[in-house]
Amino acid sequence: FYTRIWETNGTTVTSQVVNMEMAAEYLNNHGIEKQWDEETCQNYGEYQSGNSYFQVWLEDADSIRVKLSVMDQYQIGGVAEWRLGLEEPMVWEVIAEYMSRN
């Protein structure tokens, strides 16, 4: 459970890994309103500062809920996450809700 804050400056693209809480704080601290991106099924935020353009696709309870529904749709037997401990508590509530139905 993690995401990246992407920075594009000219032709240079860099990123930093952040946990779910840090990503939400980043959006809040920079006055970025997240919007649902139908293509990626994730909340998304962006802003520009000087010559840099910043983008964040959020892995959060909303996106996890969609991923779990895809598991149902395609009868996928399980899911893996990159690293435990980077998630928000709400994610476990979404997973528990999914598990109680299946």
Where are these regions (language model features)?
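Short acidic, glycine/proline-enriched helix-loop-strand junctions
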Residues: 88-102
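Conserved, mostly hydrophobic/aromatic
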Residues: 71, 79
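Conserved residues at the C-terminal ends of beta-strands
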Residues: 82
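Glycan-binding loop/region signatures in secreted carbohydrate-active enzymes
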Residues: 1-70, 99-101
